Each structure stands twice: as C-alpha cells, then as structure tokens.
C-alpha cells in the first residue's frame, strides 16, 4: 500500500517534506497528514478547474434538455459545447462558419448568440467565467467570496462543488499561493492512456 511504502522512510525524513500536491480524494488527505506531519497540502489546480468545468457541463446539458431536440437552442448548445467550457479570455478571435447558425461567426459571437436563448444559462456561464477568472488570477479571497455569495442560489451540481471547495478551502488557497502542481505527472498519465488507447489492447507493439 501507499502507507507502507512511505513508512519505509524514517519519521525524521518525512518531517522534512514541505509540500504535497494531490486531488480532493478524501481517503488520502488524512493519510498524507499522518505520514508527513509538517507538510502543507496543496490541491492540484487542474482538479479544481476540472470540478468547476464538470459542474457547468452538467448544468449546460440540463438546460439544453429543456429544449426540443430539433430547435436551434438545443443544437447550438450541443454542437458548440466546447466553446462554453473554455475560459472566455482564451476564445479564438478567428471567425469560422457555423453550420448551426448558417453564418460565419467568431467563437465569442456563437457564445453570445446561444446565451440569449436562456437567461439561466447566461447566469451560470457568467458565474463560471468569473470563478475561472479569480482562480487563474490567484485571487483566493474573491474566489471564495463569490462561492459564499452564490452557494444558496445555485443548482445541486454547483452546490456540491462549492461545498467540496469549502471543505478544502485552505488547501485550495495553498494552490493559489504556491507554484506547485501535478501538471507534469498528469501529462504523463494522459500520454500513457493515449498510448494504451492507440494500442488497441496490444501489449507489445512489435507483435502488432
């Protein structure tokens, strides 16, 4: 087990560990605190953004399903979903032809047109983007103030995420105050998954 692996190291050595980056898995946090009593726990930034993204994704789908499947709002929300997940500041400025709207538009114009179909979606989109902004700019106080202001008003998708963030508030603030992350490790894991997917189950590419 992970516990037994790290217990191979003397307590004196483990006490020298200053930082640990991890996801929000409840099982590992108590273990990390026991094994490395002097370390600050840092929630990996990727996982924080991922939680917010999933909450908005589920919200968009729920609102999308309120429309007829043949309607323009439904098709716009379904076909251009990736644009809504992005940080709005990173949307491309290059126009493209939208088969959904039958016209050439910039990504931000597609987003604006689609948000006009639903005030509820527009409100959640603005909340999501503001949370991303505060997080990316490392404004921890503003990030959590926004959560506190909205936790009683949001749907259960966002409420669940907000409660999780509340629970790990200090660890998330640590993520905003330090430069540590699991980015390289996550990138390696993704590469391994991609290789396995492309391998179609073959264990040895020589036998392919």
Region roles according to the model:
Residues 3-42, 46-50, 69-208:
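Acidic/histidine-rich catalytic cores and adjacent linkers
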């Amino acid at each position: 087990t992970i516990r037994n692996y790290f217990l191979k190291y003397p307590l004196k050595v483990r006490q020298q560990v200053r930082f640990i980056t991890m996801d929000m898995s409840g099982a590992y946090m108590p273990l990390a605190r026991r094994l490395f009593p002097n370390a600050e726990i840092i929630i990996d930034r990727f996982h924080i953004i991922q939680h917010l993204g999933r909450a908005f994704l589920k919200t968009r789908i729920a609102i999308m399903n309120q429309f007829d499947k043949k309607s323009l709002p439904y098709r716009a929300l379904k076909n251009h979903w990736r644009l809504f997940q992005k940080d709005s500041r990173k949307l491309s400025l290059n126009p493209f032809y939208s088969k959904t709207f039958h016209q050439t538009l910039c990504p931000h114009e597609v987003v604006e047109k689609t948000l006009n179909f639903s005030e509820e979606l527009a409100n959640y989109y603005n909340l999501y983007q503001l949370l991303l902004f505060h997080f990316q700019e490392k404004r921890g106080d503003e990030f959590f103030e926004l959560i506190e202001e909205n936790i009683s008003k949001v749907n259960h998708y966002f409420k669940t995420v907000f409660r999780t963030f509340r629970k790990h508030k200090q660890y998330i603030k640590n993520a905003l105050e330090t430069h540590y992350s699991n980015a390289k490790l996550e990138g390696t894991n993704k590469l391994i998954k991609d290789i396995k997917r492309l391998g179609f189950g073959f264990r040895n590419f020589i036998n392919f």
